[in-house]
A protein has these predicted regions:
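Electron-transfer interface patches adjacent to heme c in soluble/periplasmic c-type cytochromes
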Residues: 2-128
Length: 128
């Protein structure tokens, strides 16, 4: 699953590792962690355009959410997923399929995977 995550370029936005910069609090300086995000705004396409702007973000731009802990969110939300910026996706697979804009190639690559590979990728994402 992890290799498929890289292969279809989910890592283009969902970076596996980030490193903190300098902090006067020494234990926080230059620490590497794995949030699976780049914390940046990305064009997610017309399908996720909700007509609202926030700060400098256009109506179709969304900050990449961290994927760490996503597998736990189903259990913490009464057995349901509420994914994407407005909770409209009810499964990880549905959230992937809603990707557009900058992520359209990753979405298409996901849809072209075999069922076995899709399941392996989804299992990996749930393990984060």
């Amino acid at each position: 699953g992890k290799q498929l995550f890289k292969q279809i370029n989910c890592t283009g936005c969902h970076k596996s590792e980030l490193t903190t910069g300098y902090s006067p609090i020494s234990p926080l300086s230059f620490k590497t962690f794995s949030p699976y995000t780049d914390l940046l705004l990305h064009d997610m396409g017309a399908g996720l355009d909700d007509g609202y702007t926030e700060g400098s973000a256009k109506t179709f731009e969304w900050k990449t959410p961290a994927l760490w802990g996503i597998g736990l969110s189903e259990n913490s939300q009464g057995g349901n997923y509420f994914l994407m910026h407005d909770g409209r996706a009810r499964s990880i697979e549905e959230a992937i399929i809603m990707h557009g804009g900058e992520a359209i190639n990753s979405k298409n690559a996901f849809q072209n995977l075999s069922e076995t590979d899709k399941n392996a990728l989804l299992k990996f994402i749930k393990s984060l």
